């Protein structure tokens, strides 16, 4: 906020091996920091709640792990319930020829599993739905909050 940012999309409301804030809100919101509600909007990554736990599905390792048909089904179900889905990938996740770091086995699996299939899966999902930018989505959210 102090840097002039209007929104942030860095919170992942899931507990993972490497990161995550499992009890973070799962909808677009104004975060509280030191008891003060920020003007900045937080746009958390999309999750599916199963058995009381948040599970990622639409980006990073989860996107590469789950089959495309399942991701599409979750996105459709969310749309019917009025929920948005953020689909995101890091550049290294769509470049099977990219340089690989020498990592411990578990971290290597998480970082590189199914990188070779990510581009085709992403193309299929992009053909199946209409997407917008986070900027356009939050413009709608701000209008609805007022």
What are these regions, as identified by a protein language model?
Residues 2-83:
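Active-site-adjacent pocket scaffolds in enzyme catalytic domains
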């Amino acid at each position: 906020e102090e840097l002039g940012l209007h929104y942030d999309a860095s919170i992942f409301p899931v507990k993972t091996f490497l990161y995550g804030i499992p009890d973070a809100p799962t909808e677009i919101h104004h975060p509280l920091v030191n008891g003060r509600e920020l003007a900045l909007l937080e746009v958390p990554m999309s999750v599916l709640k199963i058995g009381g736990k948040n599970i990622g599905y639409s980006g990073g390792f989860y996107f590469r792990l789950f089959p495309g048909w399942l991701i599409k089904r979750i996105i459709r179900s969310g749309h019917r319930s009025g929920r948005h889905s953020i689909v995101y990938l890091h550049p290294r996740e769509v470049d099977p020829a990219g340089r690989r770091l020498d990592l411990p086995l578990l971290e290597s699996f998480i970082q590189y599993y199914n990188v070779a299939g990510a581009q085709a899966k992403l193309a299929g999902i992009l053909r199946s739905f209409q997407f917008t930018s986070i900027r356009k989505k939050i413009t709608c959210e701000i209008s609805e909050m007022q």
